[in-house]
């Protein structure tokens, strides 16, 4: 059995579409654990309606305690051999579980599909194929280099034991940074398939789109706990240091931080600490250009070095696109001339 866990909070506008996509799964041996996290809109009533019509749906009501608490509660109440998390404003392909389950072979603990923010892409039915397969270290390196493996908790089918080893950090946002990497740390193997099975809806008030608040500073608490969880792994710790350096700088940019901001020192201290951990490995320094740029001039990285690097990078990308377009046009012209002369 597969347990599908859905934390629910004030999503009445999207919830029915989400639950219907789970209900319509072609793999039917499922239970759907809905954890209503103190919704004040019509979400609870929608959940109750699905539970009345389909015995596979089970509703748990709790006071508002946050998404992590809701997910942990869902895991505790579930009984499936495998677990999948679905956010209540998203949609999954009706074939998703049927596609992922066959890849859950011996020693494979996680199977991941692709997600999209474009609905037209979501509805394309393409055959699945493996695009990555690896052990814990290989998967973590792939993830921190922003390749096939993602650290988000959704889009994945998990073997139950992995999820039980790593509860979600409660009381934080960005908790998936810690949980996602630690899932990879504790697993044996992961398989990633080139199958778009998950539609991720970006809402105006989501964590990724809202304006900066003090709650965004949770990324440092989560990041420090992630670093601490690898303190006994001398081989991987510098890579985690680089990952948090990258994440920390990404949040510096996303949150609109500058030298005049009251939190600037907090961001820069975290970036500095993460870079120090990363530079303990010559291999990590050699491998990651952004880290080398930072170590070259730490004081000027956010204000001078990185902005110049990005401008040059964007200019190179634009030039490369222009060259590719010209090559395409020349190729088409050659074909046309060949046909004409023939």
Functional labels for PLM-detected ranges:
Residues 29-38, 58-63, 88:
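Short beta-strand/loop segment that forms part of the nucleotide-sugar
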Residues 259-342:
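Membrane-interface aromatic/basic loop that binds lipid-linked glycans or pyrophosphate carriers
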Residues 83:
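Short aromatic/hydrophobic "clamp" motif used to bind/position activated sugar donors
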Residues 21, 28, 36-45, 65:
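A conserved acidic beta->alpha catalytic loop
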Residues 62-78:
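Glycine-rich, basic loop-to-helix element that forms the pyrophosphate-binding segment
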Residues 67-68, 88-191, 201, 205-214:
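Donor-binding/catalytic cores of nucleotide-activated saccharide
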């Amino acid at each position: 059995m597969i347990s599908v866990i859905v934390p629910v909070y004030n999503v009445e506008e999207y919830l029915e579409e989400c639950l219907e996509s789970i209900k319509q799964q072609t793999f039917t041996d499922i239970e759907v654990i809905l954890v209503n996290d103190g919704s004040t809109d019509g979400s609870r009533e929608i959940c109750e309606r699905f539970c009345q019509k389909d015995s596979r749906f089970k509703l748990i009501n709790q006071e508002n305690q946050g998404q992590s608490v809701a997910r942990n509660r869902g895991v505790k109440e579930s009984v499936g051999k495998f677990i999948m998390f679905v956010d209540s404003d998203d949609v999954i392909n009706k074939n998703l579980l049927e596609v992922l389950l066959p890849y859950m072979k011996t020693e494979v603990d996680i199977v991941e599909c692709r997600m999209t923010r474009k609905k037209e892409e979501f509805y394309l039915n393409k055959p699945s194929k493996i695009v990555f397969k690896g052990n814990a270290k290989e998967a973590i390196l792939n993830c921190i280099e922003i390749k096939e493996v993602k650290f988000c908790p959704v889009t994945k089918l998990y073997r139950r034991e992995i999820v039980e080893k790593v509860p979600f950090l409660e009381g934080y946002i960005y908790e998936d940074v810690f949980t996602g990497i630690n899932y990879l740390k504790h697993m044996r193997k992961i398989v990633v398939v080139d199958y778009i099975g998950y539609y991720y809806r970006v809402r105006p008030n989501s964590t990724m789109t809202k304006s900066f608040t003090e709650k965004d500073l949770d990324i440092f608490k989560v990041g420090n706990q992630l670093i601490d969880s690898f303190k006994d792994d001398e081989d991987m710790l510098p890579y985690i240091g680089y990952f948090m350096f990258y994440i920390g700088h990404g949040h510096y940019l996303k949150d609109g931080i500058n030298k005049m901001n009251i939190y600037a020192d907090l961001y820069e201290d975290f970036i500095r600490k993460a870079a120090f951990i990363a530079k303990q490995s010559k291999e990590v320094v050699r491998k990651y250009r952004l880290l080398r740029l930072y170590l070259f001039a730490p004081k000027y990285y956010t204000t001078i070095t990185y902005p110049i690097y990005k401008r040059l990078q964007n200019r190179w990308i634009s030039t490369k696109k222009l060259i590719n377009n010209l090559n395409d046009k020349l190729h088409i012209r050659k074909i046309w001339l060949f046909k004409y002369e023939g």
